[in-house]
């Protein structure tokens, strides 16, 4: 790191798997920005101290991954509307002793669906599978795309209803029907199905029936790599178009980069390079 390079990082536990340093290094090269971005493994009980240490080093911003997104939102000085709605933050901006929290996950998901996959969300029927932090982080930006309907399903129905209730005002403003449905019988023929659960990681079956799919539906798993494969295989086996969350990863990083540097990096070539690197075993 040169003296002129601004310091950024991603904090999480675990963190060794993170592709964020590579992504942001490519963004910096493509936009002519001078920065250094690194991984930081944070003890489960040491997140607040890690933020203090990073700020003392002159850190300018950091991405936050599991399990610290809720704590990041709580510890920030100011919070974006997206963070206030989701209750979680994945991007922190350090400025003059203050910490501003934002959440770019939903923006990344929307960009990858509408631009990467070329599927518009306006006027569509969307099924959001899961009601945890991942789902909460994306529901607001999904609603802002003016879909006709978003149905939320979850193993614990009360959590799905709570997520719906917390976003009811925004849904009404967007004139979108937002409701919680039975996970085992959510209805049929959704245009877009988004898996925001860790069902594949847990070794369980896909948590919704195949009746939610129709030929031409987009089935999107917010995970990527082996974790997403069971869901993707299930979707293609029932005639849907399947897409993993690697594009979401790159797009949310691009949004964070824009917040930090004031420059929007090109995401498409970086995603193409990243897919090639992963396919080659890098």
UniProtKB/Swiss-Prot annotation:
It is an enzyme of class 1 (oxidoreductase). Keywords: Amino-acid biosynthesis, Aromatic amino acid biosynthesis, NADP, Oxidoreductase. Gene3D superfamilies: Leucine Dehydrogenase, chain A, domain 1, NAD(P)-binding Rossmann-like Domain. One of its GO terms (cellular component) is cytosol. InterPro entries: Aminoacid_DH-like_N_sf (IPR046346), NAD(P)-bd_dom_sf (IPR036291), SDH_C (IPR041121), Shikimate_DH (IPR011342), Shikimate_DH-bd_N (IPR013708), Shikimate_DH_fam (IPR022893), Shikm_DH/Glu-tRNA_Rdtase (IPR006151). SUPFAM superfamilies: Aminoacid dehydrogenase-like, N-terminal domain (SSF53223), NAD(P)-binding Rossmann-fold domains (SSF51735). GO terms for molecular function: NADP binding; shikimate 3-dehydrogenase (NADP+) activity. Pathway: Metabolic intermediate biosynthesis; chorismate biosynthesis; chorismate from D-erythrose 4-phosphate and phosphoenolpyruvate: step 4/7. The active site is at residue 69. The keyword NADP applies. It catalyses: shikimate + NADP(+) = 3-dehydroshikimate + NADPH + H(+). NADP(+) binds at residues 81, 130-134, 154-159, 222, 245. Its EC number is 1.1.1.25. Shikimate binds at residues 18-20, 65, 90, 105, 224. The keyword Cell inner membrane does not apply. One of its GO terms (biological process) is amino acid biosynthetic process. Homodimer. Involved in the biosynthesis of the chorismate, which leads to the biosynthesis of aromatic amino acids. Catalyzes the reversible NADPH linked reduction of 3-dehydroshikimate (DHSA) to yield shikimate (SA). This is Shikimate dehydrogenase (NADP(+)). It comes from Acidovorax sp. (strain JS42). The gene is aroE.
């Amino acid at each position: 790191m040169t003296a002129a390079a601004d310091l950024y990082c991603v904090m999480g536990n675990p963190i060794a798997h993170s592709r964020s340093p590579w992504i942001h290094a490519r963004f910096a090269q493509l936009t002519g920005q001078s920065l250094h971005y690194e991984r930081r493994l944070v003890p489960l009980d040491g997140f607040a101290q890690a933020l203090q240490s990073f700020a003392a080093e002159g850190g300018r911003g950091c991405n936050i991954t599991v399990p610290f997104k809720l704590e990041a939102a709580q510890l920030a000085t100011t919070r974006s509307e997206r963070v206030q709605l989701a209750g979680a933050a994945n991007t922190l901006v350090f400025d003059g002793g203050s910490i501003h929290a934002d959440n770019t996950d939903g923006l990344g998901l929307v960009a990858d669906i509408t631009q990467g996959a070329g599927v518009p969300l306006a006027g569509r029927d969307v099924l959001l599978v899961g009601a945890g932090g991942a789902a909460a982080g994306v529901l607001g930006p999904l609603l802002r795309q003016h879909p006709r309907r978003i149905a939320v399903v979850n193993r614990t129905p009360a959590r799905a209803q709570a997520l719906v209730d917390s976003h009811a005002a925004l849904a009404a403003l967007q004139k979108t029907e937002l409701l919680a449905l039975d996970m085992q019988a959510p209805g049929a023929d959704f245009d877009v199905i988004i898996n925001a659960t860790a069902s594949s990681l847990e070794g369980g079956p896909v948590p919704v029936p195949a009746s939610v799919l129709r030929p031409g539906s987009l089935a999107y798993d917010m995970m990527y790599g082996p974790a997403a494969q069971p869901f993707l295989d299930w979707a293609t086996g029932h005639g849907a178009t399947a897409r993993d969350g690697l594009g979401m990863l790159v797009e949310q990083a691009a949004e964070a980069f824009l917040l930090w540097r004031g420059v929007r990096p090109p995401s498409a070539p970086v995603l193409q390079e990243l897919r090639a690197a992963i396919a080659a075993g890098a």
